[in-house]
């Protein structure tokens, strides 16, 4: 299910006027290939240097609140809007969720995309029934264009 605030909807509606032919599969494959499980969390590890036994997980949870907060803080990636056009955001979010689900089945993945000037931020976390989503369900509360794939 896709959710977005009004600002993102306007941007995507404008993007429908343009031809969106950029392929996101290569970008997504690189992201998914650099993820691993740390303490039952899916974590993006760009350098492959994270070692579970060296992570003070209790201290991290103290600062971020829960596993969702940990994942979202680890899984923050920024890209130029020139690399992937906003009209591709729904496809990007859905495919990333699907690819991570396939790799880490049966965990359901929530993907967020938000815009900041000339770049966009991509974040993701595992959906946990005992924890809240990272962002409020009312995405119009935020002052940036945001899309959420659940």
Task: Write out the residue ranges for each language-model feature.
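N-terminal leader/targeting segments
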Residues: 1-73, 77-81
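Acidic, proline/glycine-rich low-complexity IDRs
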Residues: 87-90, 94-150
